[in-house]
Amino acid sequence: MTLKDNYGRPVLNLRVSVTQRCNLRCSYCHREGQELPVEGKVIEMTPDEIARLVRIAVNLEIRNVKLTGGEPLVREDITEIVSKIGEISGVKDFSMTTNGTLLAKYAEELHEAGLKRVNVNIPTLRVDVYSKLTGGSLDNVLNGIGEAVRVGLYPVKLNMLVLRGVNDGEVEDMIRFAAETGAILQLIELEPINLPDDYYRRYHRTLDDYEVRLKEKALKVETRRFMHNRRVYHLPKAKVEVIHPIENTEFCLHCTRLRITSDGKLKPCLMRNDNLVDVLTPMRNGASDKEIEELFREAVRRREPYFKG
């Protein structure tokens, strides 16, 4: 039976952070809502531990798994992690979010190991702006996207976080790029997670005006019911999804996600770190699968109807 919280929301998606390490320094990164580790106390789950938790989640009828970070591809054993998850019967949608800088190197072996698709974070198509925002090389990301498309990590999704006064004039360019590469564009509104208040106030902008223009051009508008009711605009040559942050009432109302932090804690809410459920310690102390299942159920019981701030 599908896991449901006390408010009737099914839990269908598992996001597994495999590391908090990253090879970029993006000023806007929210790290999946995870707090930075105490210096010298970095804990990461092993490939076997990650696979075991995914297997238990699948037994609870969670079918969609996404690997996140940090940057998943900085883990030297990332292909092993992907391979172990890829062998689990019952995983329907298996994807990864990456900054793309190492994707050209890993795309083929990840696909062969069982990864189905990737989301690539790409806030801009301008080399100088990309370098300023992330400290990285845009060429590496573009090469990674091209390689992901070539090997069949389909569909490739492009995550464009829209920042006021920085890249909000590039949306049309990014739509054209998505059309040219055969990718799906996701426009993402800045969220106030792990960010200084002044940064959020300075760079946040609503996406409502983009949605008005997208609706005018769309051949069809689709609503993804189990993905925060986000809207998908089918344009003549591209597909664009619009992702609003936590202030959007649909965000919590239709949340179907459970997260696992890189140090092995179940995270019921993206915005909170005061209701985590530790599963790594019990696993390392010999807990059975049934006992870990009960910890999953406890995490789901801790889900609230909405984030209260």
Question: Predicted regions span which residues?
Answer:
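Radical SAM/AdoMet-radical enzyme domain recognition
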Residues: P47-L67, E71-I188
